[in-house]
Each structure stands twice: as C-alpha cells, then as structure tokens.
Amino acid sequence: MCVPICSCENSLISNKFIDLQVNGHGGVDLQSANSIEQVQTVARSLAKHNVAAFLPTIITGSLEQMLKQVTLLNSAAKKQSSDEAKILGIHLEGPFISKTKRGVHPEKWIIDANLEIAKQFVSLGNIRLVTIAPETTGANEVIKFLVKNDVIVSIGHTNCSYEQAMVAFDAGAKSVTHLFNAMPKDLDSGIMRAIQESKQVYVQIIIDSIHCTIEQMKFAIENFADRLIVTNDPITAAGLGDGEFPFGEMKLIVKDEIARRQDGTLAGGVATMESSVKILKSIGANDELIKDLTYSRALELLKTTL
C-alpha cells in the first residue's frame, strides 16, 4: 500500500497518545504496586508525556498476585483525577503464553490456557485485552470465551505455527502483541505469514529502535499501516535514565536506554511516545499517519472514544 510521507520536518502532530501496554512509569512498577496512590503516580507520569489514556498491563505472575493487581487497578480506575492519563481497562500479558518465547516473564508461573482461571479474571471486571499464545493447550476455548465477554485477544509471546495462528484469528483473536518481539522474526515464519494474510487483525509494535530495527519498522508501516498501533511497553524506569529498577519479582538493569534482565534478556521499554513520534517522522511517516498509529487506531481497536 502507499504510505503517506511527511513533507515537513517540523509540521505539527497530535500531542495526545494512547498506550495499550504500560507495565509501569515514573518509578512505579504495576506488577508490585500496592496502593492506589502508586497507580496514580503512573497515570500522572504518563500524562506529563502527553499520554491521554492507557491500559495498565500485568505480566505473568502467581494467580494470587495477578488477581490482586487487577483488583487494585480497578479501584484506582474509579478514583482518577483530571491530571492523570485515563485507565481504559486492563491488559493481561499472560499467564497463558509460551515458555520458549517468554522474554522476561517468570517461567514458573506460565501455564496452559485455563478456562476457569480466565473466568476468574473476567469476573473482576475491566479486563480489556489479554495476550495469549495460541499453541498452549486450551487456548482456542479460552479465546472464544474472552471474545464472547468483550475482551480483546492479542497473540503474543508465542512460537505458534501458521495453522495455530489462523485458528486463533478465526476464533476471534484480533490483535498481535509487540510485533517482532517474543515471536519468530522471520517473515516466512508461520505467525508472520498469518499476520500478513489476516487483514482484520491489528498489529501492535514498539517503536524505539531497540525492540525493532529500522528495517522492521519500515516493513510494518509499508505492510500494516492501516492496522498498525504503536505501543511503548514502558516499565518502571521509563524516562528515568540508567539504573536498577523493580519489575515484578525481578530487577531490571537499564543502561544506555536499554532495559535488560541480569541474564541479558531484553525487557520492556524506557522510551516515551514523543520519542516514538520522532522515529516515525525520521522514517517518513506523515502527521496523519502518526496520529492514527499513536492515538486513533488504539481507540478503534478498543471501540471507544475519549
């Protein structure tokens, strides 16, 4: 497809963003936050970087801990003020994911898709998006249940085949979590072929020149521009510089704007949506496309407005 090209380096862009994957911000980790005030710190920190709304994201942990964090986030969502980025719902990134593509998710808490556990999460309310690996046992049943209950299913942290991805999309999965990360990167791989063929599926991507190469970002824009969504996948350290920061049960080391576990595994992002916009402009995206990728498209996926 034809991609709009930015004709003016300093042309105006939308100064409001939506982020569908926020693990933490402003020094607070949402995996271990234990007060509404801490969640508010995240929301205020995001707002300072022009994020209008977001999905607080809980990664794989013990069932008890994940349920506790969902309850806390729901309480915080009911007590928001005008200086906070709005909570649009909760993103569960796990625990039904692939152990081989787990990234920094703790392996001991990763489980096959489980309908009864999915029901526990949904019963708490406000679950808007769930990342799942379609190759896990029971995934198809859980996907259908989530879709029936108006939860968006996103394929991610997966090593699935083409056939498994297509079965998931046919069951109602309508998104992909952080393209090129925690999945096979080869364009001829099963999941990549399935994504390219499934025009109804939205594609989320981290734009920070760390999680994806310039070539991968250009490929995504050239092939998925009308269904692409930019996320930052920010962690506790976002915007705070180098250092050690908590992330669930582990510590992450940030050096030169790259967050890694102690064993070197790449973790979430530390960039901002403003920096993502600069990268998008540098590779030729125009203002209209940038607004779509960083704001409008996310609302379209969520079927909501601000």
Show the residue positions of the predicted features.
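Residue-level marker for buried hydrophobic side chains located in beta-strands
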Residues: K16-I18, S154, V230-T231
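Divalent metal-binding pocket/active-site signature
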Residues: L92, K99-G190
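Divalent metal-dependent hydrolysis catalytic cores, especially in the metallo-beta-lactamase
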Residues: V22-D29, Q40-Q69, A85-S98, G125-E135, ...
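Conserved, mostly hydrophobic/aromatic
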Residues: Q21, L46, L92, L146, ...
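Active-site-adjacent C-terminal substructures of enzyme catalytic domains
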Residues: V142, Q164-L289, L302-T305
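Generic structural signal for well-ordered alpha-helices
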Residues: V42-A43, L67-N74, A118, I143, ...
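Non-catalytic positions within long, well-ordered alpha-helices that form the structural scaffold/packing
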Residues: A47, N74, V122-S123, V147, ...
